[in-house]
């Protein structure tokens, strides 16, 4: 069984990441014609807290997820209107209590790892979420590293 490297970063627990992926899949499934298609089935989530209070969520999905989320102007004059999946995802994480749960797990982890620190007050003030995207099966010429619109 693979393990995360000990980098001093808190990696969000797998059951929580699985619930996060389920939420994003539901958002997409409710919006697309084929709710059982490749895009929905390709969704994976990695999440960790880096620095001190920044929750970094990595969305791994088929490459065209970014075009659906951000929108795009096509070579033939067509337009893909932005679907704002990530903004909906952020709202759902907050309303389901998952963001609070992640920071609670992180506080617990810090208290075990560094029992002398009093971090709970700091974490409540400075929480922020950033997103990264990793494309699955990108076509030739696909530019990785494009930011997800939130």
Question: Which role does the model predict for each range below?
Answer:
Residues 1-150:
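Short, Lys/Arg-rich flexible segments
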């Amino acid at each position: 069984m693979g393990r995360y490297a000990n980098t001093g970063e808190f990696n969000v627990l797998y059951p929580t990441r699985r619930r996060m992926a389920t939420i994003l899949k539901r958002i997409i499934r409710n919006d697309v014609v084929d709710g059982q298609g490749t895009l929905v089935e390709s969704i994976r989530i990695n999440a960790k807290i880096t620095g001190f209070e920044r929750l970094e969520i990595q969305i791994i999905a088929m490459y065209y997820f970014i075009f659906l989320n951000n929108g795009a102007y096509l070579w033939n004059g067509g337009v893909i209107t932005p679907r704002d999946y990530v903004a909906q995802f952020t709202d759902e994480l907050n309303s389901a209590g998952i963001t609070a749960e992640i920071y609670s797990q992180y506080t617990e982890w810090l208290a075990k790892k560094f029992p002398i620190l009093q971090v709970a007050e700091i974490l409540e003030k400075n929480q922020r979420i950033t997103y990264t995207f990793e494309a699955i099966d990108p076509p030739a010429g696909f530019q990785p590293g494009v930011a997800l619109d939130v």
